[in-house]
Swiss-Prot record:
Phylogenetic classification of the source organism: Eukaryota, Metazoa, Chordata, Craniata, Vertebrata
Annotated disulfide bonds: C66-C96, C78-C100, C83-C95, C89-C104
Keyword Signal: yes
Protein name as it appears in the record: WAP four-disulfide core domain protein 1
Entry keywords, A to Z: Disulfide bond, Protease inhibitor, Secreted, Serine protease inhibitor, Signal
Function text: Has growth inhibitory activity.
Signal peptide: 1-31
Amino acid sequence: MPLTGVGPGSCRRQIIRALCLLLLLLHAGSAKNIWKRALPARLAEKSRAEEAGAPGGPRQPRADRCPPPPRTLPPGACQAARCQADSECPRHRRCCYNGCAYACLEAVPPPPVLDWLVQPKPRWLGGNGWLLDGPEEVLQAEACSTTEDGAEPLLCPSGYECHILSPGDVAEGIPNRGQCVKQRRQADGRILRHKLYKEYPEGDSKNVAEPGRGQQKHFQ
């Protein structure tokens, strides 16, 4: 039997198929790159559409930056230019309800951040010693001491006094320790001392509050 060889036509068909496959792969890669480049824009458009809400549907105002709705209809409220999203308004305005329709209104500034002062807890010292109710205002992490051990005591700023939290031990050379608190005044103008730590001969100790002026002292 004669051998059947591969003719020129068969080779051309294989080359054409290979070229077609290569073109398909290049087209698929190009389409993938185009889709990746277009995806962020599509997501941004979707976000804006969701913010604006459905066409003709109700849209709730942003309560955090919108002024409260007026109780009475302001003049010209229904004739104001309407909006559907904050992006349609100038920089310092928000799309809010003006009593008749959604329009660009002045944004309300966010509420201020309050830095609450620390309220110390009363602490029992053991035996007959205790601390009275803590002061109303305390400087955050402001330590102080009234013990004079040859050096200047760690005093508080003007208008504050040292509220003793730990009496220390003079015999052991341990100074007392406290926190700076704002001074309170009585009706007659005298400063109310938050606490004076007293020790009695029989060994008992207690803390008392009494009016007076000047720095706190350690009584023997």
